[in-house]
UniProtKB/Swiss-Prot annotation:
Protein's job: Formation of pseudouridine at positions 38, 39 and 40 in the anticodon stem and loop of transfer RNAs.
Family statement drawn from the similarity comment of this UniProt entry: Belongs to the tRNA pseudouridine synthase TruA family.
Protein name: tRNA pseudouridine synthase A
Top-level taxon of the source organism: Bacteria
Lineage: Bacteria, Bacillati, Bacillota, Clostridia, Thermoanaerobacterales
EC number(s) given by UniProt: 5.4.99.12
Subunit structure: Homodimer.
Keyword terms: Isomerase, tRNA processing
Entry's Gene Ontology BP terms: tRNA pseudouridine synthesis
GO MF entries: RNA binding; tRNA pseudouridine(38-40) synthase activity
């Protein structure tokens, strides 16, 4: 099992794609270079283009004699600077980085001031209009619990179960930065970014906090807010 951090700016997400560079591909090539083995790396979360990870977990099968504690040093020597393996450890054969996870936690950063910040342009969503953070906090409360989150998913695989349990959803402001964190037993495609976009609409007064339960009940994507851009999103924790 590997614990990985990466800056997603220059990658077309986690999952392997034929004609685009991805984090999975870069890591698999590094593992092959170090161990001489072609592996299939399974990630806990298939992050999208531009999304970052402070705690991604991945597993693969290997016969390498390199001790797990030495593996991060070997891999980091051949990986690009924007992908780092911070830990490696041996796990049971039944372990699956994605399906063994009990919960995942994401963080989203919003820069809420008149002008953008050049050094943060790839790491947050710049919203130039003042946001009512207290209203956003009230709205966040209604997302907690077990619901059908069909109104908060992008069109895609309709066979995926839309019922998810959100254990925690917080909104905090520190200076010009608004930090939104959400933890759940699983997420639908773009669910976190649509929840963030909806909270921003609440902050702008376009949606009232008290309307959130009705939006959830509607199961209608058009009733929710916009999809927040990817660069403000970070995978921060996986619980097994």
């Amino acid at each position: 099992m590997l614990i990985i951090e990466y800056d997603g700016t220059n990658y077309h997400g986690w999952q392997y794609q034929k004609n685009a560079i991805t984090v999975q591909e870069v890591l698999e090539k590094a593992i092959e270079k170090v161990t001489g083995e072609k592996v299939n790396l399974i990630g806990s979360s298939r992050t999208d283009t531009g999304v970052h990870a402070l705690y991604q977990v991945a597993n693969f099968k290997t016969k390498t004699k390199i001790p797990p504690e030495k593996l991060p040093y070997a891999l980091n020597a051949v990986l690009p600077d924007d992908v780092v393996v911070v830990k490696a450890k041996e796990v049971d054969k039944s372990f699956h980085a994605r399906y063994s996870a009990r919960s995942k936690r994401y963080r989203y950063l919003i820069l809420n001031r008149q002008f953008p910040m050049p050094t943060m342009r790839n790491y947050c969503w710049h919203v130039p209009y003042p946001l009512d953070v207290e209203a956003m906090k009230k709205a966040a409360f209604f997302f907690r619990g077990t619901h059908d989150f069909s109104a908060f998913k992008a069109s895609g695989n309709k066979k995926v179960n839309p019922v998810k349990t959100i254990f925690d959803l917080t909104v905090e402001k520190e200076g010009d930065l608004i930090k939104i964190e959400v933890e759940a037993d699983g997420f639908l495609y773009n669910m976190v970014r649509i929840i963030v976009g909806t909270l921003v609409y609440v902050g702008l007064g376009k949606i009232k906090a008290g309307e959130i339960p009705a939006i959830i009940e509607s199961k209608d994507r058009t009733k929710a807010g916009i999809t927040a851009p990817p660069q403000g999103l970070y995978l921060v924790r996986i619980v097994y």
